[in-house]
């Protein structure tokens, strides 16, 4: 996790929600302090420790946090994830942004852990894709790692992937790879997306570093993996669901990339319970929304 980027993101998210100030919290709490607990309301895998630690302290440096869970830990209903102490206005102002983020990231980590469990193949790495929420890619990919998965390229800038439209524009896989290599240099990996055995053989001849078997059934993936030289990495992707994932066990590919890890997840249920002068904030007044 890049903490400079994290702080930049959190500042943006807090400004979106708080704007020129939290009218409710500022008018009611003033300088009063409170205690808070972030609590799991459902089972899953936790992701977002840095968000809790960095988030509230950005709003007020006097906020103290004690984390009882680390990224990748199993959460059970009712377990305390973190304890917080500090100005009530800061904790209540930051509550919704922090909860929104850790709920979503924990949902992604939970889905990733389930995908790893369903595949049950230590030789194949479960990877994410670029099908992430705009503005949240760094965080969502961090959550995939917390769940036991691996990251595919972060963007169009850190890896070359030659797809059908690129091949059509160049006339062949060989020509597309040649142009990409000349432009990017030898330090950047080139991945080629293929669907047929003929395309596979052309990608091998073109010197691809990684070959993706796109929308291929398990038997085809197994066959293509056997045809691919050991020095070339292989990846299966496209149309793979949690239900179909076990059929890819033992196919011999190095990676399986799954869009649903980030685009179709359900957020984990996590709440923040606040007490003020031995009395629940909710008993004093309604402040959550």
Curated annotation (Swiss-Prot):
Reaction(s) catalysed by this chain's protein: nicotinate beta-D-ribonucleotide + CO2 + diphosphate = quinolinate + 5-phospho-alpha-D-ribose 1-diphosphate + 2 H(+)
Tagged with keyword Glycosyltransferase: yes
EC top class, as a word: transferase
Gene Ontology biological-process annotations: NAD biosynthetic process; quinolinate catabolic process
E.C. code: 2.4.2.19
Subunit-structure text: Hexamer formed by 3 homodimers.
Annotated protein name in UniProt: Probable nicotinate-nucleotide pyrophosphorylase [carboxylating]
Organism: Bacillus subtilis (strain 168)
Gene: nadC
